[in-house]
Amino acid sequence: MPVVAADPKRGHLRSVLERRRGYELLGDMDGDSICRYSGGVLRDLISLARDAAVEAYIAGHDSVTSQDIENVAQQLGTGYLRGLGPEEIKILHHLEKSKSFDVSQAANVELLVTRRVLEYSSTDFRVHPALLSVMPSPEPKSA
């Protein structure tokens, strides 16, 4: 069953971080970055916040920095990228460019259930933001 993500621009994700006292280590902008990179997936939000705190601790920072967040977002994105072949990456680039996604195709369903593509509504599908941040550029078309 695909994950229906919460829109990361809404306050729900921020309230989760606030309830978990995440803002004690995060600035407002850093919290917004974590919400954005999570794509609205609660599991990813919590993982990113926890991993950013660990990253900051290991680096000897007193609080989470934007670089800590970039590092853990890249790690999450790389995890989603792992195992994707050229065809799947082509599908993701097509989705990003056209905003069109056919859920009747088996390859597309696989991208949905593995959270590489997030469903915000029945007509709003997006590439997971952490994956998008590390995705290789599209192959140039041959002449």
Report the location of each language-model feature.
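C-terminal leucine-rich, beta-strand-based interaction scaffolds used for sensing/assembly
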Residues: 67-143
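Amphipathic alpha-helical "lid/sensor" segments that cap RecA-like P-loop NTPase cores
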Residues: 6, 27-80
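Repeat-unit-sized solenoid/scaffold elements
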Residues: 12, 41-61, 119-140
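The catalytic "switch" region of P-loop NTPases
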Residues: 1-31, 35-37
